[in-house]
């Protein structure tokens, strides 16, 4: 017999949507069978609230947009904070009718520890805590080698991943969803105030956020850009990528919805496969993170754990500010500063420059990207940095060192991208745009760009640094 007074509490984390939401689907199905209502809540970790990276601006604005959307539909997103035990206790005190908590799981990093603590606390209250795999297309321990061990190389992983049947999007009955949403009094006024203050302190303002915009962008990309994705995705001056990553980060759209939307699209099959392979890379790096839980702080390749990386603050600051004297590197870093996002080709170029040209510790780069990227995904970011630094799983060989000038000429031939983010070089002609240091003094005056005044000279000599990097990784550097 059903209990019409019971409440199902759905814990939203990085899944701010009402469609294709696995935990929400199960909560609604329970309500259909047994009656009751559901409420939504968000746990604001005090550690998260105490720092103000750019990606938090985007994330918290998404949370606020979702909260407002729920209010429009008769509900609310309740904010709780404090220790996880204390926060959940407040929630249960405010809503004693709660008889189950539902969430999409977090199986890596701090989220894993938080969920273990939450499960332990709720068990003491005799309240079941149901968690579901949702954020990825495959579970981290699903695609393994025949001997049950994780893959170390992406290509064979991808072949196995491609054969795996992917979960289809979760269908949620909209009438039941909106008809059973609960509206009550906020359980934690302190948390609501803390959250509102975080919103007020946001230094960046994003308008195209949330579920509705995510779906529109997916549809637009599929219709207008997918067919040219394979050919255009590496050129930053072309709008050739999906720009879906911030929406994936916040869960405004699910990877399942994207996967099946692309799979069923009438587009070039090679471009579609190339795009889907990026989703496989996301699953791959999450799998690596699952089996290498210390990879944020430690190289996966044991042979490189004792490298004597540089921590030169002047070089690091030049890199962060986009003042290295290498236009393609600086354009990428300035895009990151201005937009909280960077084209993927530039992520590789800038990471290679930091670790191979400056020989600066990859962890410093990873931490900076963590602070700045609005699409920051721990597993993918760590994996990408260890790849660039040649110290991770299936990493680029240490002797493959990106030449920033060659990369610039190949992927931004006419300097369109460079000029977008480095106005000092607007008048510099194409034949100097990649190497402005080759201009004579007369040409610098003519093109309104005086080196070391308007735009910096290169902070390193790439050819010399390449030789130094090779020695560094071989272990025969003298420093």
UniProtKB/Swiss-Prot annotation:
The keyword Lyase applies. FAD binds at residues 229, 241-245, 278-285, 375-377. It catalyses: cyclobutadipyrimidine (in DNA) = 2 pyrimidine residues (in DNA). Residues 278-285, 344-345 are annotated as: Interaction with DNA. DNA binds at residues 233, 407. Keywords: Chromophore, DNA damage, DNA repair, DNA-binding, FAD, Flavoprotein, Lyase. Its EC number is 4.1.99.3. The record marks 309, 362, 385 as: Electron transfer via tryptophanyl radical. Its cofactor is FAD; (6R)-5,10-methylene-5,6,7,8-tetrahydrofolate. Binds 1 FAD per subunit. Pfam families: DNA_photolyase, FAD_binding_7. Residues 6-137 form the Photolyase/cryptochrome alpha/beta domain. One of its GO terms (biological process) is DNA repair. InterPro entries: Crypto/Photolyase_FAD-like_sf (IPR036134), Crypto/Photolyase_N_sf (IPR036155), Cryptochr/Photolyase_FAD-bd (IPR005101), Cryptochrome/DNA_photolyase_1 (IPR002081), DNA_photolyase_1_CS_C (IPR018394), DNA_photolyase_N (IPR006050), Rossmann-like_a/b/a_fold (IPR014729). One of its GO terms (molecular function) is FAD binding. Involved in repair of UV radiation-induced DNA damage. Catalyzes the light-dependent monomerization (300-600 nm) of cyclobutyl pyrimidine dimers (in cis-syn configuration), which are formed between adjacent bases on the same DNA strand upon exposure to ultraviolet radiation. PANTHER family: CRYPTOCHROME, CRYPTOCHROME CIRCADIAN CLOCK 5 ISOFORM X1. Monomer. This is Deoxyribodipyrimidine photo-lyase. It comes from Alkalihalophilus pseudofirmus (strain ATCC BAA-2126 / JCM 17055 / OF4). The gene is phr.
């Amino acid at each position: 017999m059903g209990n019409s007074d019971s409440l199902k509490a759905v814990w939203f984390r990085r899944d701010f949507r009402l469609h294709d939401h696995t935990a929400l689907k199960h909560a609604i199905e329970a309500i259909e069978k047994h009656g009751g209502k559901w409420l939504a809540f968000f746990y604001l970790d005090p550690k998260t609230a105490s720092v103000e990276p750019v990606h938090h601006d985007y994330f918290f604005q998404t949370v606020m947009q979702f909260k407002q959307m729920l209010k429009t539909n008769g509900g609310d997103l309740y904010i709780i904070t404090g220790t996880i035990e204390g926060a959940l206790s407040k929630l249960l005190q405010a809503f004693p009718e709660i008889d189950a908590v539902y969430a999409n799981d977090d199986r890596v990093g701090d989220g894993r520890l938080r969920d273990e603590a939450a499960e332990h606390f709720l068990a003491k209250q005799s309240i079941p805590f149901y968690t579901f795999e949702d954020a990825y297309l495959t579970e981290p321990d699903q695609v393994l080698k025949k001997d049950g061990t994780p893959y170390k190389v992406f290509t064979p992983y991808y072949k196995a991943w491609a054969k795996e049947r992917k979960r289809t999007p979760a269908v949620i009955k909209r009438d039941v969803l909106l008809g059973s949403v609960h509206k009550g009094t906020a359980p934690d006024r302190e948390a609501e105030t803390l959250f509102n203050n975080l919103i007020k302190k946001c230094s960046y303002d994003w308008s195209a956020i949330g579920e509705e915009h995510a779906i529109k962008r997916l549809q637009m990309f599929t219709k207008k850009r997918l067919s040219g994705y394979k050919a255009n995705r590496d050129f930053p001056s072309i709008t050739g990528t999906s720009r879906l990553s911030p929406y994936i980060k916040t869960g405004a759209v699910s990877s399942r919805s994207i996967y099946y939307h692309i799979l069923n699209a009438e587009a070039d099959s090679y471009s579609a496969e190339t795009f889907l392979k990026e989703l496989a890379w996301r699953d791959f790096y999450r799998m690596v993170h699952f089996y290498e839980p210390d990879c944020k702080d430690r190289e996966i390749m044991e042979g490189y754990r004792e490298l004597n990386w540089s921590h030169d603050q002047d070089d690091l600051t030049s890199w962060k500010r986009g003042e290295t004297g290498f236009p393609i590197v600086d354009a990428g870093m300035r895009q990151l500063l201005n937009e909280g996002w960077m084209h993927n080709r530039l992520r590789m170029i800038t990471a290679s420059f930091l670790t191979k040209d400056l020989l600066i510790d990859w962890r410093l780069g990873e931490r900076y990207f963590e602070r700045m990227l609005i699409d920051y995904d721990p597993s993918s970011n760590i994996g990408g940095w260890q790849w660039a630094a040649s110290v991770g799983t299936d990493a680029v060989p240490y002797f493959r060192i990106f030449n920033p000038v060659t990369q610039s000429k190949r992927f931004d031939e006419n300097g369109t991208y460079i000029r977008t983010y480095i106005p000092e070089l607007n008048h510099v002609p194409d034949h100097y745009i990649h190497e402005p240091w080759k201009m004579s003094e007369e040409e610098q005056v003519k093109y309104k760009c005086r080196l070391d005044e308007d735009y910096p000279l290169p902070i390193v000599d790439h050819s010399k640094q390449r030789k130094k990097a090779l020695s560094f990784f071989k272990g025969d550097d003298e420093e």
